């Protein structure tokens, strides 16, 4: 399975308008496309950064959808004030403990490794890091997206409420240090978001 992320910086005061556009215009459009298996949206109301992710059953379906989403991407650029940064990924891991409701928070960890090391990284993540993450307070789900050509990774860890994410902060930071060392991965950035749209229908992979 594959995913396309669209990252954009918005004026924090107009984020709700952007969310409404994605919910009411973009989501119905992409969900009607062949091979689409859902959409999610993360928003940082302080910085204005938003990430819209669409998931696809195959890489071919993702690429064939490109023509159809150009108009909606241009419309989003009008609302947000700039064109999004678009990246394509393989969804390597999807694991859910339970569904999320209103108020869920997601921490995204971007990193990189040697491209040829990706299979070892994913094996270590599944066998050692992920079981420890399940013990974190409020842990709801995690997904790991990778670009095998560049070695880039993006791990999204979702908690059911801001309070439980806060409770898990120290242990989560410890797991990042331990996990990145064990996986041979360099962490590039860590950021936190509200999970404002959660409609990914990606099947469990573990």
Residue ranges with predicted function:
Residues 1-51, 57-206:
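Short S/T/G/P-rich N-terminal loop/turn motif that feeds into the first structured element of a domain
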């Amino acid at each position: 399975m594959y995913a396309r992320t669209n990252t954009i910086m918005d004026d924090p005061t107009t984020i709700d308008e952007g969310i409404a556009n994605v919910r009411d215009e973009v989501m119905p459009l992409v969900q009607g496309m062949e091979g689409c298996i859902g959409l999610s949206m993360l928003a940082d109301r302080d910085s204005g950064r938003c990430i819209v992710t669409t998931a696809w059953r195959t890489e071919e379906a993702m690429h064939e959808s490109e023509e159809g989403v150009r108009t909606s991407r241009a419309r989003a650029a009008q609302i947000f004030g700039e064109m999004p940064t678009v990246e394509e990924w393989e969804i390597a891991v999807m694991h859910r403990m339970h569904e999320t409701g209103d108020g869920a928070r997601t921490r995204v960890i971007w990193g990189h490794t040697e491209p040829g090391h990706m299979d070892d990284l994913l094996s270590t993540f599944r066998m050692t890091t992920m079981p420890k993450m399940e013990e974190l307070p409020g842990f709801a789900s995690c997904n790991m997206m990778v670009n095998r050509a560049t070695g880039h990774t993006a791990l999204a860890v979702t908690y059911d409420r801001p309070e439980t994410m806060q409770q898990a902060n120290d242990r989560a930071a410890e797991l990042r240090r331990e996990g990145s060392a064990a996986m041979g991965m360099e962490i590039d950035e860590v950021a936190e978001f509200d999970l404002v749209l959660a409609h990914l229908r990606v099947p469990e992979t573990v």
